[in-house]
Amino acid sequence: IIPMLYAYYHQFDLHPETIIRGKGNRSGAFFIFWEQSFERLSGEGIGKNSPDYFFFFHTFLWVFLPWTIVGLIAYWKKARALVMSKFKYNPKSEILTLGGITFIFIIISFAQFKLPHYLNIVIPLFAVLTAAFLYDAYEEGKQRKMKILLGFQYFILSIIFIASVMICFFVFKNDNFYSYLWKGALLILIGYYCLKSEDYFFKIITIGALSSVLLNAVLNTHFYPSLLEYQGGSEMAKTIQKNNIATDNIYKISLNYSWALDFYNQEPVKITTVNALEGKKNIWVYANDKDLKELKQSGFDWNKQFTEKQFRITRLQSRFLNPNTRKQVVNKMHLVHID
């Protein structure tokens, strides 16, 4: 935690003159430990982005894959047992895990500014709760219960398999022969363990682990690399590096965010105006279609232009995932050289 506090000390305490969200003279430690947390709850300063009180519930459904169904059953069983006991103290029963999950879920669900990663704090608690539930079921030796849980795991595996096929053959069609080899080998391995005779408890664990491996392998080796091709900023950064363009000589004439380009260039794009550009020579302008039109109407011309596809990849939608309608929502970002 020391590097984080050191960074916030440099950003806030050493620059009291800096106005951040309408306030100056801020303490970095106070901001990260107190202010920003309560600002997210109230929406003050940071803004409001979701009135959906069930946002984290339906987010949890995919975040906790492939243990989602088992995890929800574990929570329900634990909560039901606590209610049925009328909350009486039981030295053999642990309630901190259940209480932690419930308390945090309630707090973050009422936050006015919500992001999926808020769930990170409850995932370990859910993992402990789920593992304890599975172990207790195994110790009880109730084969029928274990068989039902295994059925749920097979259901999750089938959903992940269908999603993987759709990703590889429809959303972003894969033409790499070598990619088919390892995917085929993984499917053979999964098939082997599905058919292998094994105790229900161990099979639940095995199927869950293989589901996780399949999902993450497809996402990290195919889906996300393909998706990043539509993040104009990161792709343009590759072009900038390839053509040895000076990153301190790049400007933009709008207030549109350029976080990806800033990050991969390791330098923020300078903000300017069309009028201010008139006195500059040998510069590059990072622009969208609207900005290019404005430059053209203002009498600017350029001798070099690089163009990349642009889509806000953190806001996926069906029209983008469907290759037949993708062009309708994909924009373009340009880098032009004004001599």
Which residues does each PLM region occupy?
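A cytosolic-side transmembrane-helix exit/cap motif
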Residues: A137-I148, D199-F202, Y224-G232
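Short periplasmic/luminal acceptor-recognition loop of GT-C membrane glycosyltransferases, typified by
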Residues: I207-K332
